[in-house]
Swiss-Prot record:
Listed Basic and acidic residues bias regions: 290-307, 345-363
Keywords from the UniProt entry: ATP-binding, Cytoplasm, Helicase, Hydrolase, Isopeptide bond, Nucleotide-binding, Nucleus, Phosphoprotein, RNA-binding, Ubl conjugation
Range of residues in the leader sequence: none
Record carries keyword Phosphoprotein: yes
Region (Disordered) location: 61-179, 279-363, 808-857
Annotated motif Q motif, positions: 193-221
PANTHER family: RNA HELICASE (PTHR24031)
Native source species: Mus musculus
Modifications the protein undergoes after translation, according to the UniProt entry: Ubiquitinated by MDM2 without targeting DDX24 for proteasomal degradation. Instead, polyubiquitylated DDX24 promotes interaction with NIP7, a component of pre-rRNP processing complex, and associates with pre-rRNA molecules and pre-ribosomal particles.
Modified residues (Phosphoserine): S80, S92, S170, S288, S296
GO molecular function per UniProt: ATP binding; ATP hydrolysis activity; RNA binding; RNA helicase activity
Protein name (record): ATP-dependent RNA helicase DDX24
Lineage: Eukaryota, Metazoa, Chordata, Craniata, Vertebrata
Length: 857
């Protein structure tokens, strides 16, 4: 039996071209009888005969498939010729001959090893559903034919051979890492003994050691034991950056591993296969590498083996040779887009080769191999396809992507497959991901409900769902938001209800209760809601039945202890001044929040004119651009990200130093989540609020809800630099307004002209936005813009923070002293604020009372 190799991941054909394929003939051509009456008209006189072929295979890269033996023979002949030439050349140096012989011997050894290697690699099928199959060249003594013939022999080029050897010795380029805004982690080999009492699976412990998580956080320590051991529903509330993702990811992974362990089929003893080939449910919890993909108790769908019985065209009885060749026609088929699976035919007896290089099997070896294949097929067919076992729902797309990356990192050595379903991305690609039958799906409610309504097979039966997670649940169940979530929860609790399903609900503001608006409190029969009422309402909306375990680790203030809060009172027009001053005085990774997209766009244009070059993130952006901006913001050390509340919840961006509230949030929950983007994982951070006259009401509500004991300190601002900042902001506003007005006018006028051309009508000047300007007016406007930009460019070229030296005496050169740049990088915003606090806390020294009898003149 001889099995050919094909590429595991063939390149897709380019658009507009056809991929070359060949036909592997397995059976024989049959003559088709034709009715003689069809030849009466004389239109088919040129037809000689008509034959059909029913037993064949479509193969890719046929020249490589059928000419491998010839290439091996040519290589062997070339090696022997080179050896003869080397023996005949006695005048060459001995050292060169020795090195060349060693190199040729190594090549010959590699060629022999490649011939003796007996390994099956399943190639990835095309989207059209064609199967790449490998079979023997001889079937029933008939030699197979192909449309693609072997390439003709060519003379060897020594220069090309040298180039090939150089390419083989050159180091390979490193693989591109996955795009993510999270910090890259290498193998930390941390001590995970603190996790052992929390019933964490061994495979997860290995991943935690790899990630460097030596000890659990408080929310993890209190959640894992009741969730894994007692299988209780959890309502968890903890501060931002406290590790809530792992608190629900580890119980979900444990639940999936337990399902695989229960569903694993028993190991048959009659197979005679090596123990290494039959690693099943007994090693599901040992945490072997994920490349074997067998720790979860069953081999993956990618390694599923299917056989097809080949029909015999002739009536000749099967000989041992034909039976061996028939067994060689067993197909190893992969699921669509599933990649390579583990080879199930490793360490088998190598078939003997005759002088012509053709492989022959004994009848005994063929029988053993066929029996082993049949046993494996029986095992795989006993196990059903993997259902959906874990579902995670998140409010934003970026948070869903981040949760998926966290789960993949923890499930690194478990072999569990995950998929993500979010809007803004290709629906067809996500459907193909679901076709792989992942055990865990992370999704936003909109796209998930869309695929559920389309009745995707993997989402059609949710009764086997073992774990449901709702992250940021207080936002998800708010009235007027996520209408698809209510329909999804209703389906899960009614027609797709599973009584053994575990529900985990987490949020940083799960138990925070803010005061309702006055218009609602003035109504009749309105009861003030407390923490218990809020949790009961949440349990009712989610559909929790029974009494869950409530874990509340939040403080009354809502924010973490390592967060420093400060504020600046200013007019609305002065917010741009203080924002630009802060960004220039204290550089670093700063995240600026606003309440509206229009404000984000205006700030972006203003800061770009001032050469700050910020990044933006809001709901009207394309999803790929949103992810690209997040990755760039996490990569750069000195960068500004302007974002709406899309980026307020859950995002774990490393080393964010400052969070600036350009507009005060409307609720205290949003303020807590915004401020939680910094000061994560016991690190320090700064939260700055720019409070205008219209923000005072919202600020007082937040201050009252969070029960602040002391007033939020004012941020120190050096007023001596504000005059230069005001001049820069004035020029930048004029330029930004003029450019925005010109852009809107051009956009409107171009649309009007296109519509008029389509309707074949003439336009009047009043229909143009701002009137149809003549050339003289346009030149005057451009000249004015050029002057403003030159003036601003001159101001930007001057240092903003400088100290003017004052002296009472003339200098030696007779010129005024040069200004000295202020050392703005020495002191950070946190150190400046702490220094101001220390000054305020210093007690004033009491003045000594005047002594009696002393007089003042």
């Amino acid at each position: 039996m001889k099995v050919k190799e094909t590429n595991s991941k063939p390149k897709l054909a380019s658009r507009g071209t056809f991929q070359r394929k060949g036909i592997k003939i397995v059976g024989k051509w049959k003559q088709v009888t034709i009715d003689p009456n069809l030849f009466a008209d004389g239109q088919m006189d040129d037809l000689v005969c008509f034959e059909e072929l029913t037993d064949y295979r479509l193969v890719k890269n046929p020249s490589r498939l059928f000419s491998s033996e010839e290439t091996k023979k040519r290589k062997a002949q070339a090696v022997s010729e080179e050896e003869e030439e080397e023996e005949g050349q006695s005048s060459s140096p001995k050292k060169k001959i020795k090195l060349k012989k060693q190199r040729d011997a190594a090549r010959a050894a590699e060629g022999a090893a490649a011939q003796n290697e007996y390994e099956v690699k399943a190639s990835e099928p095309e989207a059209q559903g064609e199967v790449t199959a490998c079979s023997d060249q001889k079937v029933g003594g008939a030699k197979s034919e192909s449309l693609a013939q072997a390439a003709p022999r060519k003379k060897k080029n020594k220069g090309k051979k040298k180039l090939d050897t150089f390419q083989s010795t050159s180091p390979k380029l490193p693989k591109k890492s996955k795009k993510t805004w999270m910090a890259e982690v290498h193998d930390q080999k941390a001590d995970v003994s603190a996790w052992r009492d929390l019933f964490v699976p061994k495979a997860v412990l290995r991943a935690l050691s790899f990630l460097g998580f030596s000890a659990p956080t408080p929310i993890q320590a209190l959640t894992l034991a009741p969730a894994i051991r007692d299988k209780l529903d959890i309502l968890g509330a903890a501060e931002t950056g406290s590790g809530k993702t792992l608190a629900f990811a580890i119980p979900m992974i444990h639940s999936v591993l337990q399902w695989h362990k229960m569903k694993a089929p028993p190991i048959p003893r009659s197979t005679g296969m090596p123990p290494r080939e039959m690693r099943f449910g007994a090693t599901a919890h040992l945490g072997s590498p994920c490349k074997d993909r067998t720790e979860s108790g069953v081999l993956p769908e990618e390694a599923r083996i299917e056989t097809e019985a080949q029909p015999s065209d002739s009536g000749v009885q099967a000989t041992p040779e034909t039976s061996a060749s028939a067994s060689a026609q067993t197909l190893l088929v992969c699921d669509d887009d599933a990649g390579e699976g583990p080879s199930s035919l490793e360490e088998k007896p190598v078939p003997k080769q005759n002088e012509d290089g053709e492989e022959k099997f004994d009848a005994e070896q063929a029988g053993k191999l066929k029996q082993e294949l049949c046993d494996q097929i029986a095992i795989y067919k006993v196990h059903p396809r993997r259902p959906l076992l874990g579902l995670v729902l998140t409010p934003t797309r970026e948070l869903a992507i981040q949760v998926r990356q966290h789960i993949d990192a923890v499930a690194k050595f478990t072999g569990i497959n995950t998929a993500i379903l979010v809007g803004g991305m290709s629906t067809q690609k996500q459907q193909r991901m679901l076709n792989r039958h992942p055990e865990i799906v992370i999704a936003t409610p909109g796209r998930l409900w869309e695929l559920v309504k389309e009745k995707h097979p993997h989402l059609s039966n949710l009764r086997q769902l073992r774990c449901l997670v709702i992250d940021e649940a207080d936002r998800m169940v708010e009235k007027g938001h996520f209408a698809e979530l209510s329909q999804l929860l209703e389906m899960l609790n009614d027609s797709q209800y599973n009584p053994s399903r575990q529900t985990l609900v987490f949020s940083a503001t799960l138990t925070l209760v803010h005061q309702a608006p006055a218009r609602i409190l003035h109504k009749k029969h309105v009861k003030k809601m407390d923490k218990t009422d809020k949790l009961d309402l949440l349990m009712q909306k989610v559909g929790m039945r029974g009494k869950p375990k409530v874990i509340d680790l939040t403080r009354n203030e809502g924010t973490v202890e390592t967060l420093t809060e400060t504020k600046i009172h200013c007019e609305t027009d002065e917010k741009d001044l203080y924002l630009y001053y802060f960004l220039m005085q204290y550089p670093g990774r700063s995240l600026v929040f606003a309440n509206s997209i229009s404000c984000i766009k205006r700030l972006s244009g203003l800061l770009k004119v001032l050469d700050v070059m910020p990044l933006t993130l809001h709901a009207c952006m394309h999803q790929k651009q949103r992810l690209r901006n997040l990755e760039q913001f996490a990569r750069l050390q000195d960068c500004v990200l302007l974002a709406t509340d899309v980026a307020a919840r859950g995002l774990d961006i490393p080393k964010v130093q400052h969070v600036i509230h350009y507009q005060v949030p409307r609720t205290s929950e949003i303020y807590i989540h915004r401020s939680g983007r910094t000061a994560r994982a016991a690190s320090e951070g700064l939260s700055l609020m720019l409070i205008g006259p219209e923000d005072v009401i919202n600020f007082k509500k937040i201050y009252k809800t969070l029960q602040k004991d002391e007033d939020i300190p004012l941020f120190p601002v050096q007023s001596k630099y504000m005059d230069v900042v005001k001049e820069r902001i004035r020029l930048a506003r004029q330029i930004e307004k003029a450019e925005y007005r010109n852009f809107q006018a051009c956009l409107h006028n171009s649309w009007i002209e296109q519509a008029a051309a389509a309707l074949e009508i003439e336009l009047e000047e009043e229909m143009y936005k701002g009137g149809k300007a003549d050339q003289q007016e346009e030149r005057r406007r451009q000249k004015q813009m050029k002057m403003l930009k030159q003036e601003l460019r001159h101001l930007l070229s001057q240092p903003l923070f400088q100290e003017n030296l004052k002296t009472r005496y003339p200098t030696q050169s007779g010129r005024p002293p040069q200004p000295v740049l202020a050392s703005r990088n020495i002191e950070s915003a946190l150190s400046c604020l702490s220094r101001q606090k220390r000054r305020r806390k210093k007690p004033k020294e009491p003045r000594a009372p005047p002594q009696p009898g002393s007089s003042t003149s």
